[in-house]
């Protein structure tokens, strides 16, 4: 169980970081 929970947390963190970077690049290109 702990491994699945940690894996899900890592996946969620990676998805959040990716979305933040994508939004940042979009804003930079928009400017």
From Swiss-Prot:
Record key words, sorted: Chloroplast, Electron transport, Membrane, Photosynthesis, Plastid, Thylakoid, Transmembrane, Transmembrane helix, Transport
Annotated membrane topology: Single-pass membrane protein
Residues spanning the membrane: 4-24
One Gene Ontology molecular-function label: electron transporter, transferring electrons within cytochrome b6/f complex of photosystem II activity
Domain of life: Eukaryota
One GO cellular component term noted in the UniProt record for this chain: cytochrome b6f complex
Localization per Swiss-Prot or TrEMBL: Plastid, Chloroplast thylakoid membrane
Main location per the UniProt record: plastid
GO aspect biological process, one term: photosynthesis
Quaternary assembly: The 4 large subunits of the cytochrome b6-f complex are cytochrome b6, subunit IV (17 kDa polypeptide, PetD), cytochrome f and the Rieske protein, while the 4 small subunits are PetG, PetL, PetM and PetN. The complex functions as a dimer.
Role noted for this protein: Component of the cytochrome b6-f complex, which mediates electron transfer between photosystem II (PSII) and photosystem I (PSI), cyclic electron flow around PSI, and state transitions. PetL is important for photoautotrophic growth as well as for electron transfer efficiency and stability of the cytochrome b6-f complex.
Family from the record: Belongs to the PetL family.
Name of the protein in its database record: Cytochrome b6-f complex subunit 6
Protein's organism: Olimarabidopsis pumila
Gene (UniProt): petL
């Amino acid at each position: 169980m702990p491994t699945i929970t940690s894996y899900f947390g890592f996946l969620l963190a990676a998805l959040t970081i990716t979305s933040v970077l994508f939004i940042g690049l979009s804003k930079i290109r928009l400017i």
